[in-house]
Structures are given as C-alpha cells and as structure tokens.
A protein has these predicted regions:
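Short beta-strand->loop
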Residues: 105-115, 201-216, 264-271
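Acidic, polar ligand-binding/catalytic clefts
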Residues: 70-140
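Bilobed "Venus flytrap"/periplasmic-binding protein-like clamshell domains
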Residues: 40-55, 121-161, 173, 190
C-alpha cells in the first residue's frame, strides 16, 4: 500500500481548504418578477430568457440563483414595489423614464434591441383601406390610439399631440378596439403577432394593419431596487448580458424569438412615421450600434 508523502498531504489540505465545507451552500441570489396578466399574455418570455441566460453564464463566478414569479402587476404597481423596497419584486422590465433613472438601478442595455420601439397597429379589419390612405403625421393625429392605463407610451404619444384612450385591463383593450372605443391599438413588433394569433378566433374583427411602421426610441431595460442587494442583482445580470453580447449568445436568442416576427410583419417594406421620446436621456447608449435593431440593415 502506498502512502502519500508530506508534500502531497499539504497540497491536498490547501486545495480542500479552498472548497466549501460539506453541506455549506452559497447564498442564492433571488430575482422576483411579475406574473403574466392573463393566460394569453406571452409578452415577456423572451426578456426573461435573456435574464435567465445571463444568470446561467455568471453562475461560476456569482453562485446559484433563482427566478421567482410573483403576482400579475401593472407597470405602475411594479415601479411602486421596486421604489418602496417591499420585497415583492426585485426586477422589472420597462422603458426608461427620468423618474426611474433617478430612483431605480437600470442596466443600460435595451433588452429587445429597441425592436419594441417599432410599432404596428391592431385595427378593425374593415378599416384597412382607411389606413392605406394615411401619408403624414397630421393624418395620424386624426386617429385615437388605445393604450393601457399607466403605460409609459401614453405620455410619449401625448407629448407629440396624439389623442390617447386608456383602459385599465390588458385583455379588455382588445375588446375596446373591436367595440370602436378607439381607432387603433398601438402594439410593439415584439408583441403583436402573438397577441393577434392568440385572439383572432375569439375576436375575428381584429386585423394587423399592413402598411405602417410607427417608431420612437424606446429602450426597455431591466430595473432593480436602489438597495445594496439591488446593486448586486443588477451587477450580476449586466455582467452576464455583456458576456452574451460578446460571444454572440444574445444575438442568437434575439434571432430565435424575433426573426420570424420581423419577417412576417415585413418591417422593411412599411412606410415609417417617427416621433421623439422625451423620456430618453443622455445615458442612453445610442453609440453602441450592437445594442440597437434597425429594420433597414437587419439580415
């Protein structure tokens, strides 16, 4: 039987001392996000996969994590929970505002590459010919836009003089459109196909307008509470997202979720209308072209 010499034993002890003691576990970093607003609400699947992947690739450095689904919440409610450090949420996904920049911790990487800033209209099927004739922003100003109560887009559109009708219930907005409470339901290119496909049988009057692309810069970020733990959660997620951008993982996930939407909506062929977003500040990373989708150059 061979016995280890003194140097081998010493080396073994040094290595073992660097490892966690048996049964010891690292503190689990917990990311709590809101639940979908209905069984048909799949708007956030891509964004949570981006976050989950960022946490996976940083596990060797940061240790274990878990993602917890809380209750359904409006954007207003999510912001309240984060700003007041209630513990009911530790992360939300929403567009930038000066208030959020001041009172929360953002990761300044547009999660959807600003694809959500390219919008199309859900309309009533019989109205398509009316929309075909629209050629200027003044033409669009004659229409009423449907949006959710408290959505950041409401103030953006009102700042450009558009007439906005709001509804407090996400599912109810689709019915409001069909009932002619407003002329169009403004939807992000990231959302509209799933919304239409999941509701077209129940609401056969729904139609995706097929000629217009409505754009404003809308960087959608992950936001965290302004606490020590919030800073840790944000630092880990940002590190993972930047690793994904560098090795191409980010683009691959984006393409898997978004390419068919970009192609099916024919974004390159639509006539585009642009308005400014007064919420966008100097911290917006416009200079890094890797972070921004452009339909004219997307391949």
């Amino acid at each position: 039987m061979h016995r280890a010499g003194p140097l081998v034993l010493l080396f073994t002890l040094v290595v073992l001392s660097a490892l966690p003691a048996a049964g010891a576990t690292a503190a689990v970093m917990t990311y709590i996000h809101h639940a979908p607003e209905s069984s048909l609400d799949v708007r956030y699947e891509y964004h949570w996969e981006i976050l989950r992947t960022a946490l996976e690739v940083t596990t060797p450095k940061w240790g274990p994590y878990r993602m917890v689904v809380s209750e359904p919440m409006t954007e207003q409610r999510q912001a309240y929970e984060l700003k007041n450090h209630t513990g009911k949420l530790t992360v939300m996904y929403v567009s930038t505002t000066p208030d959020f920049e001041k009172n929360l911790i953002p990761i300044h990487i547009p999660v959807d590459k600003n694809l959500g800033g390219y919008c199309v209209f859900l309309i009533r099927k019989d109205d398509q010919r009316r929309f075909d004739s629209l050629r200027t922003l003044n033409d669009l100003h004659k229409l009423s836009f449907g949006l959710g109560l408290g959505w950041i887009d409401v103030d953006i559109l009102k700042a450009s003089g558009f007439r906005v009708v709001t509804g407090s219930d996400y599912e109810g907005l689709f019915a409001m459109l069909v009932q002619k409470r407003f002329d169009l339901f403004l939807r992000a290119a990231t959302e509209v196909l799933d919304e239409y496909d999941n509701r077209k049988e129940a609401l056969p009057a729904l139609h995706i307008e097929d000629s217009i692309l409505f754009y404003y810069p809308l960087p959608m970020y992950f936001w965290f509470p302004k606490t020590a733990e919030g800073r840790r959660l944000a630092a880990r997620a940002e590190e993972g997202m930047r690793m994904m951008i560098a090795d191409g993982t980010y683009d691959r996930i984006f393409d898997r979720y978004q390419r068919h939407k970009i192609e099916r909506l024919r974004l390159k062929r639509r006539r585009i209308f642009r308005i400014p977003n007064p919420n966008v500040g100097p911290e917006t990373p416009f200079a890094d072209k890797r972070l921004w989708f452009d339909p004219s150059t997307y391949k």
